[in-house]
Amino acid sequence: MAAKWEKKDNNQGELTFEIAPDKIKEGLDKAFQRTKKNLAVPGFRKGRVPRQIFNQMYGEEALYQDALNIVLPEAYDAAIKEAGIEPVDQPQVDVESMDKDQPWVLKAVVTVKPDVKLGEYKGLSVTKQNTRVYQKDIDAEIEKQRQQQAELVLKEDEAAAKGDTVVIDFDGYVDGKQFDGGKADNYSLELGSNSFIPGFEDQLVGHKAGEDVDVKVTFPADYQAEDLRDKEATFKVTIHEVKEKQLPELDDEFAKDVDEDVDSLEELEAKTKDRLKEQKVTAAHDAIEDEAISEAVDNAEIAAVPEAMLKDDIDRQMDQYLANMQQQGIEPKMYFQLTGTTEDDLRKQFADGAEKRIKTNLVLEAVVEAEKIEPSEDEVAAEVKDLASQYGMEESAVRSALSDDMLKHDIAIKSAVDLIADSAKQDKKKDAEDDE
């Protein structure tokens, strides 16, 4: 009997399939070899009992469950391939029949990917993107570089102003008691940077080096340390130094300091314009891509996403995020302590976008099928080369880590994204256009 698939409600169905007698025999043989190793039968050394004696004493049926566990994975994989379905979680498998010398018949309750009915996905209307670089953009970028080149110079007997940097000792108290993280010595703080609790920096403006200041603040309601939220605190602050920024002149020498490949401020501005143009073009492409794909997803009819797919997506996002933290030397436990969050908080954060991510992928897969996108071997080889270069790996290592099917799937999805984005028409105006 060929595998038989019967679709039910809620993305589930019943898959009925058989395990052939020759495969059953292989499973029984392996099951017996495992079982007899620890079997002690009077008259035989441990692990040496003949198969015939075992069958007489216990019956061959005693091996059925172990044999089924051995042969089921291969039989199930073959059945889902024959039925042309894509399960999204582990099936619930029940035995229909296990008759001697007959195929074993099994029935699995399987959850599959939701059905997708594509709507319009080519030639979609998207917002027109402005990639023009204005002089104000160039000036702002040059000013940012100027700020980065600034030197901090001591202010002698002058009061601190916004934009100045103060070097301070501080010691915080809540209800007259010190608290963790509330004390530091020789701390450099730029006034106006808003890196401290609201109100802290403002109260240091107007004070000079050598002065002691009592700073009174209230911790925000969303402060990361829950025990300090909405609490009033007093920080005893000693100002050791007040420094102001000394900005370099906007001239050719400044340009050379910023970029050794230019000889003048004019050249720096031209190079900055080119770089900003490239950034705007990239940002515009990304915006068009995001809007077009989002519209294609909205246009599609998609059945409810199974819980198993949502859980799998959230797990994958969390694992990837925490792995990135570990690469930066931050273990998960330390991350949750530093952020004042829990694993459940992080799960909720990723849960918010899980359904959208899954539906997007489902639509892209449907586009791949509709457009009959089939990556070539040359495209696979190019993808392997790119990944090897990106991650500093040998190409052979990439091929070992990723199967051809995985590589072809990723390439096909990228092609579907390009098809949707490249065919989009920029004919929607932004709410407020820049007329400069």
UniProtKB/Swiss-Prot annotation:
Keywords: Cell cycle, Cell division, Chaperone, Cytoplasm, Isomerase, Rotamase. One of its GO terms (cellular component) is cytoplasm. It catalyses: [protein]-peptidylproline (omega=180) = [protein]-peptidylproline (omega=0). Pfam families: FKBP_C (PF00254), Trigger_C (PF05698), Trigger_N (PF05697). PROSITE patterns: FKBP_PPIASE (PS50059). It comes from the Bacteria. It is found in: Cytoplasm. Its EC number is 5.2.1.8. InterPro entries: PPIase_dom_sf, PPIase_FKBP_dom, Trig_fac, Trigger_fac_C, Trigger_fac_C_sf, Trigger_fac_ribosome-bd_bac, Trigger_fac_ribosome-bd_sf, Trigger_fact/SurA_dom_sf. One of its GO terms (biological process) is 'de novo' cotranslational protein folding. GO terms for molecular function: peptidyl-prolyl cis-trans isomerase activity; protein folding chaperone; ribosome binding. Coiled coil: none annotated. Residues 163-248 form the PPIase FKBP-type domain. PANTHER family: TRIGGER FACTOR CHAPERONE AND PEPTIDYL-PROLYL CIS/TRANS ISOMERASE, TRIGGER FACTOR-LIKE PROTEIN TIG, CHLOROPLASTIC. Belongs to the FKBP-type PPIase family. Tig subfamily. Involved in protein export. Acts as a chaperone by maintaining the newly synthesized protein in an open conformation. Functions as a peptidyl-prolyl cis-trans isomerase. Consists of 3 domains; the N-terminus binds the ribosome, the middle domain has PPIase activity, while the C-terminus has intrinsic chaperone activity on its own. This is Trigger factor.
